[in-house]
């Protein structure tokens, strides 16, 4: 996967349209932070799903996860910063945008989410990576940039890292999830302008052309006041 990213990035750089092709476009604060504002709610939703899964599934998931969370500071930086950037550039910046040139935007989001989930390997990881891919893809589709999903992905992974370093006590875990619940309510309210912008209708979007090739070519403006 990393090799694919390097090859594609090198090609796009040579074409002098790297940021444009990967949708690393500037977005204003309300839209930029929308994904991060939704991250606590997404983490709570995933946690609820994990609670009802068979114990045998969770054993393999926990074994795979332990290798990721035991890398010290470097491991944390890889999970919270490097992985979200690389994965969002690949799955949303490269794959979703190319799919959207051939199929409607909603299908490009769905297909890229399936690929995103499948590349995580473990069935449990697919079970939460797929819906996360749908949310990340939708946000980027409406914003015309992958920066919102990069921050959302970082926030989601960061929440998991905080949980991993908590003391092993019921009180600590309860306090963590209560704080997460409060964040899931408060942050979307604070970012209501950015969230509202995502659902503003784009009258010029058409199947196969939902995402602008140039910022601002559609009447829909996700950071419009």
Region locations from a protein language model:
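Alpha-helical transmembrane segments in multi-pass membrane proteins
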Residues: 1-15, 30, 34, 176-178
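Structural signal for the C-terminal ends of transmembrane alpha-helices
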Residues: 9-18, 139-141, 186-195
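Membrane-helix interface segments
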Residues: 18, 28-31, 72-73, 103-110, ...
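Juxtamembrane helix-loop-helix connectors linking adjacent transmembrane helices
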Residues: 19-89, 97, 101, 197-207, ...
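Membrane-interface helix/loop boundary segments of multi-pass membrane proteins
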Residues: 86-111, 138-145
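Small-polar-interrupted transmembrane alpha-helices in polytopic inner-membrane proteins
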Residues: 105-120, 154
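Functionally important transmembrane alpha-helices
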Residues: 113, 124-180
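C-terminal membrane module of polytopic membrane proteins
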Residues: 154-225
């Amino acid at each position: 996967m990393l090799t694919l990213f390097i090859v594609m990035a090198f090609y796009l750089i040579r074409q002098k349209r790297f940021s444009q092709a990967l949708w690393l476009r500037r977005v204003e604060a309300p839209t930029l932070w929308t994904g991060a504002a939704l991250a606590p709610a997404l983490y709570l939703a995933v946690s609820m799903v994990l609670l009802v899964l068979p114990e045998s599934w969770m054993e393999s998931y926990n074994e795979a996860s332990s290798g990721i969370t035991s890398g010290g500071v470097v491991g944390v930086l890889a999970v919270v910063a490097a992985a979200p950037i690389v994965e969002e550039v690949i799955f949303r910046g490269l794959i979703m945008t190319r799919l959207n040139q051939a199929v409607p935007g909603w299908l490009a989001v769905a297909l890229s989410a399936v690929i995103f989930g499948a590349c995580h390997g473990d069935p449990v990881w697919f079970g939460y990576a797929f819906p996360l891919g749908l949310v990340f893809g939708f946000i980027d589709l409406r914003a015309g940039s992958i920066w919102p999903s990069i921050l959302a992905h970082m926030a989601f992974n960061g929440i998991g890292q905080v949980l991993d370093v908590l003391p092993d006590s019921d009180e600590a875990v309860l306090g963590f999830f209560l704080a997460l619940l409060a964040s899931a309510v408060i942050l979307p309210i604070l970012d209501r302008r950015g969230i509202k912008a995502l659902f503003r209708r784009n009258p010029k979007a058409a199947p196969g052309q939902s995402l602008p090739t140039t910022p601002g070519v559609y009447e829909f403006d996700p950071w419009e006041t």
